[in-house]
Amino acid sequence: MATKTVEKIETFDVAGMIDELAIKGAQALKGLEKLNQEQIDHIVHEMSMAALDKHMMLAKMAVEETGRGIYEDKAIKNMYASEYIWHAIKDNKTVGVINEDKEAGIVEIAEPVGVICGVTPTTNPTSTTIFKAMIAIKTRNPIIFAFHPSAQQSSAAAAKIVLDAAVAAGAPADCIQWVTKPSIEATGLLMNHPIIATVLATGGSAMVKSAYSTGKPALGVGPGNTPAYITKEAKIKRAVNDLFLSKTFDNGMICASEQAIIVDNEVFNDVKEEFLAHNAYIVSSKSELAKLEAAVMLPDGHAVNPKIVGYSAKHIADLAGIKVPAETKLLIAEIAGVGPEYPLSREKLSPVLAMIKANSTEEGLDLCEAMLDLGGLGHTAVIHTEDEALQIEFGIRMKACRILVNTPAAEGGIGNIYNEMLPSLTLGCGSYGHNSISHNVSAVDLINVKTLAKRRNNMQWFKLPPKVYFEKNSITYLQQIKAKRVMLVCDPGMVQFGYADLVRKQLEKNPNDPRIEVFSDVEPNPSTNTVYKGLEIFNNFQPDVVIALGGGSAMDAAKGMWMFFEHPDTSFFGAKQKFLDIRKRAYKIEYAEKATFICIPTTSGTGSEVTPFAVITDSDDHTKYPLADYALTPDVAIIDPQLVMSVPASVTADTGMDVLTHAIESYVSVMASDYTRGLSLQAIKIVFEYLEKSVKTGDAESREKMHNASTMAGMAFANAFLGISHSIAHKVGGAWGIPHGRTNAILLPHVIRYNAKDPQKHAMFPKYDFFRADSDYADIARFLGLKGNTTAELVESLASAVYNLGIATGIEMNWQSQGLTKKQMDAEIDHLAEKAYEDQCTTANPKEPLISELKEIIETAYDYKA
């Protein structure tokens, strides 16, 4: 009876192999993380030296194993990978603290990305292995290679050489590993293994796409289809020499090498002759072009035939059945255009080059763009020209991440030989080529940079008008100003009651005898229409001095006119936008260059004469917008108390309570400082001591004190800013026709109580270390001598004192008493609360309000009575 022999089929656990490699890699990572910069640098230097020592042996192995390329050129590649790469990365800080900016309080700390999967091509097997191993270990990352199967032995030999050197120098045993039995399955499992942190991929489109599909932060690069444009201004001999150098280097296997030359018609024949003079063969007949195309490209014409990649021009010509001299270095296919109908205009990775005539510069650029679109987006483009403007235009138009000028593409693209680009054997193609990077990959791409940011206080400031004049008769300063054309902005009352004439008389005593133009149509709560109306007069008159005379409305309107006069392209839409930091605002108002701006207040309230603020009502939506920019700060403020002696009692009360609100809000602002708090406190003290008397008797002392308090409070809030009392007042005052100061008086007690409660949303400002509005209010109460044993009691004492002061000055302290109906309030309150939140003053409030909380404050003030 015959015995049947059953053949044993050997099975191999691919997944188990990958698991083992990954686990060893993770252990190696722990070891590498313990090494310092000096140790890492020593290890990588030893790797470089070891690879350099064996560069010839590895080159020979690569050529013998793959059958592709040129031994001598591969030796140069290996030297480049070990010498140039080491030189480029040797001083890179990749361990621990790599950068510290003590002024900014920023410390950058480098950490390894983790275990890397390195995929290498058959075209540059040993040099790419050396390169990737060195940049991986330089950044303390273990690397596990998946080599191209056709270059497994030479690639593994390169890895073994640098591994042995690394381990001998102190690196962990498994810091460099590789798949010993290569397969598509093994590469896929390695790239997708959970321990693998990133994929460093060099190869064909399919492999790179697989790397990006892993869901890991892959560093893969795309294919090239490099156009080289030789213009009529080019140095022909140099350009042709560069092309020979590039296309014959390792038989054209560097992906950055030129795939077609586009030549201006004027020098087309000269270029051909230069090529022919140096053993190029021009393929121009239809029959030879067809043969070459059949040999070089796959049948569908969409990709190069792998069988010719890296072979000599003579070998490829023989395959194509084209007789060429034995010394032929380069095959040049003369074709008519770029596109699918011209397969030889695609990437060829061999000493085969397409040549296309351009009848104009525009056509030349178009053909280069078409080359990239056909299959080289993001990679490399070359121009040979002495026209520097054209070099820049080429760079702007080409969708390539390496734009090389008067340079051989193969040697230029990898960097640091013909230019100062980062040396690399992995060339990023950016979003054009569906890559995550657009530069040459190096060690900098293989670290996680942790940023340690120390808390800092923003630099603060104290900005005021350069000149502030005060005391009675300080208006006489106008007699000495340098002026030829003075624009006076005021309201009708200033003309009616003689204040405008007072200014005019001072100017008439000025030896410069300035011309004077008056705009006196400013209304309460000035609108953009008023500003634009005044601007027309400004533009016609062209003043070199602007004087704002009156209350806040006149000064604010004048600021708006001044702003637009100085810079007509200023946008009110931009100027009204809210900001978190005045120094970083998205819209910047430019400083004045034409006219000096002088403010002379005739009421004691707004402080606008010393502030960078102007409140303007948009004529389109009837909303008050506080404009804020230090470009709006006046050049001169004249605080002359004689101008406020006849202000009516009701106006004095309203403006005085506005002063109090300025002072209290600036004191508790998140931006309050030692420079502003003293001014705030003194202004508060003056208001409580003199406002009631100023309203009821109008005596000179109290009026002067209140005038000074107004400016002092203005100085404080010009630098510390305000809070939500003003945010709400800006919106409800305009909507309900209530004077601004009176609106603040009604709101302030409720805002104090609200701000003093523990916040639901904390304010954001670095210098504001913790919530302290309650204690700030309590400090004010103590300063005023108010009663209270606890912080809460002192806060309530302050709120009550504010309310009582309002009553004492004749203000009815609720909305209802101002003629507002509940129905009207309910109909508008939601919109007004939102607008108040949007107001610029909200950002400096000691706690961030919710819109619902602003609404509650408004509601509470409707019929409130103490």
What feature does the model see in each segment?
Residues 322-458:
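Conserved C-terminal structural/oligomerization subdomain of aldehyde/semialdehyde dehydrogenase
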Residues 2-107, 135:
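N-terminal Rossmann-like NAD(P)+-binding subdomain of aldehyde/semialdehyde dehydrogenases
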Residues 93, 158, 529-642:
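Glycine/threonine-rich beta-strand-loop-alpha-helix active-site module
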